[in-house]
Amino acid sequence: MARTVIAAFDEFVKDSVNLDSERTKKARSSRDWLVDQVLGFPDKDSDFPAIYAEKYIFFGSFARRTKKRPLDDIDTMIALKAQGCTYLEYTDRIEITVPDTSAQFKKLCNDNASILNSKKLINLFVKNLKNVSQYENADIKRNQEAATLKLLSYEWNFDVVPCFFTTEDPFG
């Protein structure tokens, strides 16, 4: 039992706000293992687009080390090689146009169009996550722009968000 206000505050922060350091280590290890599995998807599924292995991004409060209890969400972006895809920004959306030369992305387009369907792309992530044997009992689904993975063995969810690494066009 704390004897001073400062000691009571420190105890409160340690026990109720800050993440437990051992759980944090376990979460980072679990996140890193997940990323390793995702990086292997193109080798196991010929329909899965190429990944920029060096371009995955840890983001969100857990990555920024500003997450407070409970540890319930870990966010990761996985960068895909654009393979000639281009994008246009509108006020309400971004459209990715897929060239005929990109067979893997063509399969993920809207019917009879060359516009990438983000739901199909995320569902491809979901399908491949379900094929990881350690995740066979996990709750895996598409949630907006992420493939969400809820493990039975941990209290946190993983949100895996696909993104693209493109090169500049002549206009910047």
Feature annotation, model-predicted:
Residues 1, 30-35, 109-172:
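Catalytic cores of NTP-dependent nucleotidyl/adenyl transfer enzymes across multiple folds
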Residues 75:
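Acidic Asp/Glu-based divalent-cation binding sites
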Residues 1-71, 82-110:
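N-terminal regions immediately upstream of nucleotidyltransferase
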